Curated annotation (Swiss-Prot):
It comes from Streptococcus agalactiae serotype V (strain ATCC BAA-611 / 2603 V/R). This is Large ribosomal subunit protein bL12. Keywords: Ribonucleoprotein, Ribosomal protein. GO terms for cellular component: cytosolic large ribosomal subunit. Signal peptide: none annotated.
Length: 121
């Protein structure tokens, strides 16, 4: 028996809301799916699109271990000692702009391990 999609669509068009509701329930039970799954996936996709994909890493304070923080800033930025010291001395300063979430978190961990206070924006 071949499926005739046009006939199926015609039958669906003629069905009442109650009949369509029963059809959906029967399909859900037969195939182990839910009609709510596509709606939830669409909502999750909307949230993912709204999530930030780039972060600015801001050094808010150097803390007590300023020399260690300067070393980490030099490593991250590639700047010389004088420039890295100026960045640390002038905190709050943006260390890295447009970093991915993983990169931003890695930089934050390094700076915090050196004793700095860091925020991601």
């Amino acid at each position: 028996m071949a499926l005739n999609i046009e006939n199926i669509i015609a039958e669906i068009k003629e069905a009442t809301i109650l009949e369509l509701n029963d059809l959906v329930k029967a399909i859900e039970e037969e195939f182990g799916v839910t009609a709510a799954a596509p709606v939830a996936a669409a909502a999750a996709g909307g949230e993912a699109a709204a999530a930030k994909d780039s972060f600015d890493v801001e050094l808010t304070a150097a803390g007590d271990k300023k020399v260690g923080v300067i070393k980490v800033v030099r490593e991250i930025t590639g700047e010389g000692l004088k420039e890295a010291k100026a960045i640390v001395d002038n905190a709050p300063s943006v260390i890295k702009e447009g970093a991915s979430e993983a990169e931003a978190n890695e930089i934050k961990e390094k700076l915090e391990a050196a004793g700095a206070s860091v925020t991601l924006k």
